[in-house]
Amino acid sequence: MCAARTPPLALVFRGTFVHSTWTCPMEVLRDHLLGVSDSGKIVFLEESSQQEKLAKEWCFKPCEIRELSHHEFFMPGLVDTHIHAPQYAFAGSNVDLPLLEWLNKYTFPTEQRFRSTDVAEEVYTRVVRRTLKNGTTTACYFGTIHTDSSLILAEITDKFGQRAFVGKVCMDLNDTVPEYKETTEESVKETERFVSEMLQKNYPRVKPIVTPRFTLSCTETLMSELGNIAKTHDLYIQSHISENREEIEAVKSLYPSYKNYTDVYDKNNLLTNKTVMAHGCYLSEEELNIFSERGASIAHCPNSNLSLSSGLLNVLEVLKHKVKIGLGTDVAGGYSYSMLDAIRRAVMVSNVLLINKVNEKNLTLKEVFRLATLGGSQALGLDSEIGNFEVGKEFDALLINPRASDSPIDLFYGDFVGDISEAVIQKFLYLGDDRNIEEVYVGGKQVVPFSSSV
């Protein structure tokens, strides 16, 4: 007779689980049992030798255990802390200009098309499908200035089961493409409408995020009002900072009375412990100290920083200042929608900084793996809910099969000594793609392969 279990058990897996903790950048748990409640939370993760005890406690039979093959493993879902959903329409192209020219020539004209909800429906459906298929279980999305289209993005992420923050972009300055901006009053009013309608929907895993595009596209009045909206509704804030040198000089010219770029956001109520700022390539020590004091986060977007020749973020310096940091794809300045690409680029950028003697060491693959999972969850304030396989967290996970059909990975005899080796895990992180991601879970629910309803 087994004990009454609360909450009821939905899934039990036996096999290898790979995740990060704050003391260990990559922990490989071989031959373990993991149980998921029907509410999607992890209720146990123990060695398989404890099966009999767990079966009595949680009332499951051996036939209910799903056993992974010796070459498969689970890892936490990937967290994309910065991605522009509308820019997916031209991802993989048009990365031939520096940031400000790139925005004016490619980005703003593309985003203006999203005044059509039909365009939004098509592109947003595709970007959510594509990112989920590639293992992004949590995404922090920029939409456009169009409220209704941004609401469609939220609806689509909820329908597919992706965990997300969704932001309606705000910009009341844009002299170069004047048709793509709002008045200050419109931007504030539409942000309030966006937030109100999002909160009324009460999506379980999709939340609104206040989204001033960046300092060059927002007046002080707008920034201050957006900061107040975020404070009133206790919301997260996302924007960009110190992406390239030309941008930083333009901010100095536009707002000469402020000490630096960070000070503009800080003085206008936009730098809080619920703020995530993309890039930060050129933040000074003084600015990093302010980030740390405020509890604000940085989204490291190495593909975009390289593709647009913007800069090289020194992640070790950010971590030294105790600033929270995760990884972002930054589609479409970053040409890849894959967080695996972000992992690889982050390692390479760190290697370049070592080569140039900026640092005395580099980031390891294991440390970057942690940034893409647990680090990203912390940057978005979700580390008590997701990011690894700790008991009590929701089961956001990827089932990885390095031997999947048409896999880009070749495995050899030496890759296996009994259970899966760390070499196989590394091969997936460096060589793998969506063909190796056989199943994706968000909150305990399998969302990939996609159901017929989506």
From Swiss-Prot:
MF terms from GO for this chain are:
guanine deaminase activity; zinc ion binding
Listed pathway(s): Purine metabolism; guanine degradation; xanthine from guanine: step 1/1
Annotated positions binding substrate: H84, A85, P86, Q87, R213, F214, H240, I241, S242, E243, D330
Q: Which reaction does it catalyse?
A: guanine + H2O + H(+) = xanthine + NH4(+)
Enzyme class, spelled out: hydrolase
**Keyword Thylakoid recorded:** no
Q: Known InterPro entries for this protein? A: Amidohydro-rel, Guanine_deaminase, Metal-dep_hydrolase_composite, Metal_Hydrolase, Metallo-dep_hydrolases
Family, as annotated:
Belongs to the metallo-dependent hydrolases superfamily. ATZ/TRZ family.
Spell out the PANTHER family in the cross-references: GUANINE DEAMINASE
Q: What is this protein called?
A: Guanine deaminase
- Origin species: Mus musculus
Task: Write the gene name.
Answer: Gda
